[in-house]
Amino acid sequence: MAAEREPPPLGDGKPTDFEELEDGEDLFTSTVSTLESSPSSPDPASFLAEDISTNSNGPKPAEVALDDDREDLFAEATEEVSLDSPEREPILSSETSPAVTPVTPTTLIAPRIESKSMSAPVIFDRSRDEIEEEANGDVFDIEIGVSDPEKVGDGMNAYMAYRVTTKTSLSMFSKSEFSVKRRFSDFLGLHSKLASKYLHVGYIVPPAPEKSIVGMTKVKVGKEDSSSTEFVEKRRAALERYLQRTVKHPTLLQDPDLRQFLESSELPRAVNTQALSGAGILRMVNKAADAVNKMTIKMNESDAWFEEKQQQFENQDQQLRKLHASVEALVCHRKELSANTAAFAKSAAMLGNSEDHTALSRALSQLAEVEEKIDQLHQEQAFADFYMFSELLSDYIRLIAAVKGVFDHRVKCWQKWEDAQITLLKKRETEAKMMVANKPDKIQQAKNEIREWEAKVQQGERDFEQISKTIRKEVGRFEKERVKDFKTVIIKYLESLVQTQQQLIKYWEAFLPEAKAIA
């Protein structure tokens, strides 16, 4: 009988649920009592761990056969108790007795997770962004403004000149503030120089505003009217945004042509910028040739990142164009609404003048005044729709075209490398034929050509790796700037919408007593 009451050997049996629960309760009670009996012990965590290890490794069968879940539960409780250090006192002091609640140990773990996720990552990300901006040279103390458009000359020889004002504390410039006069062709010439230097090596060069033959012809030969003034203002704002994006680029800012454009009082006349000149026609032919080459050259893309980004920019280009068309339609509808509101205000005023009833006549006159104010609000909102939102979309449609152009130059670089490899293979085949034909005079020439093309292959590989590395960096910088620009513009645009609606409410609330006063 005594042998039957002996515990089974280690691992040969399992305790009953009642025995397991009872031992588990004793185990946890011992832990709590240990904490309460020695609150001022120098190392409560180690003391508790020793207590638990003694109980769990003893000869008791129930403690040996504890399941994994219960051991993990106690381990978490032990881990939480070990956090009771001087650094964690403010967190644990807010709760009355966190260690006395063994049934819900997750309540002890949750504050620790929340405190980490709420404070550390935010501070780390912000400081990391600041460090990256400083390291990449994205923060520059330079302000660019384009103002004072002025018509110079008469007839078809006339052109618009703009004042470019620069304020900076950078040591590369001779003065802290200076301004120069530039015509539109000077901006196009600057972009052409920068693109020829940096586009083929992987740098994203912000595109200059496009020429408008119709708009500029109206400015040259026509009288000053609202359409001409609007065209000049659009171009001025576009030129200002172009320069601001250009000087934000750390590499382009160091370029001597850009510094000359900003500082020099006189610039050599920019040539080959006319749309209908020989150079303009040549550019159109080159674009057509590039389009054909793009269709014929198929690069076996081995980098998934480039393949993904190309698809991403294709989709963004399509969606931006759709949104831009929608915003332009919205601007047209707002202008139409403004015109109809003005017509309504005029009709209401005329009806009020012909009305014999005094109160009704006064109310109609007040209604006409309110509608005139609302007409002005619609004009201002259409202005905000265009200059805040539509122009941003238009800029980024051209910027994404520049990004896609950089990807095309990478394909050209790969094609050049591939052609060099094919030529090298042919040269080696020629050498083998010469050796078989036993022509020693031509063998040496073939070897020299092989060495030459081996160097070209190595150079092509280096160029391809370098442009790929540069594009990765440039795309990261571009996407960061894109998010910043869209965030800033969307906030300003929403603020303008809210302000417009609030002003509308004020106008109608002020008119409501007049309408109620009609008797």
Curated annotation (Swiss-Prot):
User: Know anything about its domains from the record?
Assistant: The BAR domain is able to sense membrane curvature upon dimerization. Membrane remodeling seems to implicate insertion of a N-terminal amphipathic helix (AH) in the membrane.
Which protein are we looking at?
Sorting nexin-2
* Region feature (Disordered): 1-20, 30-103
The superkingdom of the source organism is Eukaryota
PX domain location is: 140-269
Modified sites of kind N6-acetyllysine: 469
Q: Low complexity bias located where?
A: 30-44, 93-103
- Please explain the role this protein plays, according to its UniProt record: Involved in several stages of intracellular trafficking. Interacts with membranes containing phosphatidylinositol 3-phosphate (PtdIns(3P)) or phosphatidylinositol 3,5-bisphosphate (PtdIns(3,5)P2). Acts in part as component of the retromer membrane-deforming SNX-BAR subcomplex. The SNX-BAR retromer mediates retrograde transport of cargo proteins from endosomes to the trans-Golgi network (TGN) and is involved in endosome-to-plasma membrane transport for cargo protein recycling.
Mind telling me which GO cellular component terms the entry cites?
Answer: cytosol; early endosome membrane; endosome; endosome membrane; lamellipodium; retromer complex
